[in-house]
């Protein structure tokens, strides 16, 4: 029996895991590399070496999160605070689970992990020591330990010596629940949380993102209750210390646009905003790689090297990668430690208060302008609406762009009612004097997607202040303030009506989209604050 760093089998027995053969505790990258490429491994455990030096893995049938299989134990801790799927008008994935069914699922996972050689990774979620979660991840799969090491904050040796986990994640990807039907669950797979036990269980799905987004959901529960904003956004900081945050759903450009050679990256996906400023929850990045090219996204491309972990990409026999091949999934990914990006905030991923708040949307209708400047009420309206087109493959079964509304640009990860996040964000923005913008990274009347080059020029204009000084005109129906011209952007693109053969074509699509906005926002009109925001939305 080899036990690393003093972690004993007895400690794992406290979670219900018995007869552990071997504990590989906080393995080094070199050890993980050897483990993943072990020729005796079969199936989804096996890694493949690519010519870029990174290992590639296959996550099985689950190439994205499985929101329909997400459950929260409803008990005295959560009954009155959680945003439940079966209450109120808002649609979310927080399905209640009985304590009895939880115990059954826990038994399945602990039996799966018992008698095995286990990887245990202790890591932090949150760069602020006052509010971070100390999380212990337990898995029998080497690459899942690698994913966690990439994505969470890696403790120093000193921090590990005194590490006391306040959340446990047990990943039993190889086990499923045969009794799901009689228990009234969605399928044999499950991703379940217990806030009283402070534990997450995973069964049936190998997708690494369940661990990442699971802890994000927990931060989304704990922080806003303390008045700290918890945000599905990327963030970066300029030379003068000016901080920008980029909200957006998967595939709208959060990672791409915040990874900017002119600015230092704070993080690419999950952040908090407290009295000191903006801080990252993570220690790594999880970038989409479909159609990745060195020319368009050099920072991300260059981050794919030894210690990065590729998911679901096509690897040719000679080890080269076909980034254009989406036959397995459009949601091909790479995780890498944040220091694989040269231009990052060091030594801790945090900075001051944000002054620019950017909402990214990928409008499949081609109605919204590439950029508009929002009023305070429009900021709340568009934050609560969280409109985008769901882009291919970040969830199972979605391959074409379809319009979606996701509260706070991350409804799948919200644990409290959306208005609570809006209230906290607005307070933080007002205190910092921050301005919000709506940026469409999607399509226009030409049927083509707005280019990364044009979007980057728009972001530059926001960040250097030239957009705030530009003359604006108002787009009818949506009442959005659009600049008449911006440096480096074709003026014709700024007004979406110009990209159609006739203004009537835009009008017709705009009416369809406006109606969708109005219908979606109806769920917030049962409170006086929500009803007051209706005027900030589109009008037919």
UniProtKB/Swiss-Prot annotation:
The UniProt record lists the keyword ATP-binding: yes
Any Gene Ontology CC annotation: cytosol
Modified residues (N6-acetyllysine): 87, 523
GO terms under biological process: gluconeogenesis
Chain positions recorded as substrate binding sites: 65, 207, 213, 333
Residues annotated for ATP binding in this entry: 213, 232, 248-256, 297, 333, 449-450, 455
Keywords tagged on the record: Acetylation, ATP-binding, Cytoplasm, Decarboxylase, Gluconeogenesis, Lyase, Manganese, Metal-binding, Nucleotide-binding
Keyword hit for Phosphoprotein: no
Pfam families: PEPCK_ATP
Pathway: Carbohydrate biosynthesis; gluconeogenesis
Xref: InterPro entries: PEP_carboxykinase_ATP, PEP_carboxykinase_C, PEP_carboxykinase_N, PEPCK_ATP_CS
Residues engaged in binding Mn(2+): 213, 232, 269
Cofactor binding, note field: Binds 1 Mn(2+) ion per subunit.
Self-association and partners: Monomer.
Family: Belongs to the phosphoenolpyruvate carboxykinase (ATP) family.
Name the record gives this protein: Phosphoenolpyruvate carboxykinase (ATP)
Source species: Escherichia coli O6:H1 (strain CFT073 / ATCC 700928 / UPEC)
């Amino acid at each position: 029996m080899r036990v690393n760093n003093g972690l004993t089998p007895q400690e794992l027995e406290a979670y219900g895991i018995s007869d552990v053969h071997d504990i590989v505790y906080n393995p080094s990258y070199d050890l993980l590399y050897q483990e993943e490429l072990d020729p005796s491994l079969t199936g989804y455990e096996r890694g493949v070496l690519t010519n870029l030096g990174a290992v590639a893995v296959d996550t099985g049938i689950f190439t994205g999160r499985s929101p329909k299989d997400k459950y929260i134990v409803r008990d005295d801790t959560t009954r009155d605070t959680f945003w439940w799927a079966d209450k109120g008008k808002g649609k979310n994935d927080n399905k209640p689970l009985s304590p009895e069914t939880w115990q059954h699922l826990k038994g399945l996972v602990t039996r799966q992990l018992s008698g095995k050689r286990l990887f245990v990774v202790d890591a932090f979620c949150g760069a602020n020591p006052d509010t971070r979660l100390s999380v212990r991840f337990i898995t029998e799969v080497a690459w899942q330990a690698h994913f966690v090491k990439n994505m969470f904050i890696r403790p120093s040796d000193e921090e590990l010596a005194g590490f006391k986990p306040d959340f446990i994640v047990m990943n039993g990807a190889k086990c499923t629940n045969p009794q799901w039907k009689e228990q009234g669950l969605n399928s044999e797979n499950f991703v379940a949380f217990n806030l009283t036990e402070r534990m997450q269980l995973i069964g049936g799905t190998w997708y690494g993102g369940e661990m990442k987004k699971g802890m994000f959901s927990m931060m989304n529960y704990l922080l806003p209750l303390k008045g700290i904003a918890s945000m599905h956004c990327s963030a970066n900081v300029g030379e003068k210390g000016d901080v920008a945050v980029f909200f957006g759903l998967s595939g709208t450009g959060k990672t791409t646009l915040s990874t900017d050679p002119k600015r230092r990256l704070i993080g690419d996906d999950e952040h908090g905003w407290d009295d000191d400023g903006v801080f990252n929850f993570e220690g790594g990045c999880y970038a989409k790689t479909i159609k990745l090219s060195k020319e368009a996204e050099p920072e991300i491309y260059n981050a794919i090297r030894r210690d990065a972990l590729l998911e679901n990409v096509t690897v040719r026999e000679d080890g080269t990668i076909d980034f254009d091949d989406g036959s397995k999934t459009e949601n091909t990914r790479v995780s890498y430690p944040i220091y694989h990006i040269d231009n990052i905030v060091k030594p801790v991923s945090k900075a001051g208060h944000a002054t620019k708040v950017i909402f990214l949307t990928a409008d499949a209708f081609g109605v919204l302008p590439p950029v508009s400047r929002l009023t305070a009420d429009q900021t709340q309206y568009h934050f609560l609406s969280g409109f985008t087109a769901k882009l291919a493959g970040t969830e199972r079964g979605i391959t074409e762009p379809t319009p979606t509304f996701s509260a706070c640009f991350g409804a799948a990860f919200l644990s409290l009612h959306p208005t609570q996040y809006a209230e906290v964000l607005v307070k933080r923005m007002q205190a910092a004097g921050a301005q919000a913008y709506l940026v469409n990274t999607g399509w226009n009347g030409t049927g083509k997607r707005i280019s990364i080059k044009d979007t980057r020029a728009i972001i530059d204009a926001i960040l250097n202040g030239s957009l705030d000084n530009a003359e604006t005109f108002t787009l009818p129906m949506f009442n959005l303030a659009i600049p008449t011209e911006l440096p480096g952007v074709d003026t014709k693109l700024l007004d979406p009506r110009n990209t159609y053969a006739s203004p009537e074509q835009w009008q017709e699509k705009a009416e369809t989209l406006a109606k969708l906005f109005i219908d979606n926002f109806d769920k917030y009109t049962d409170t006086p604050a929500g009803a007051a925001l209706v005027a900030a939305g589109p009008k037919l």
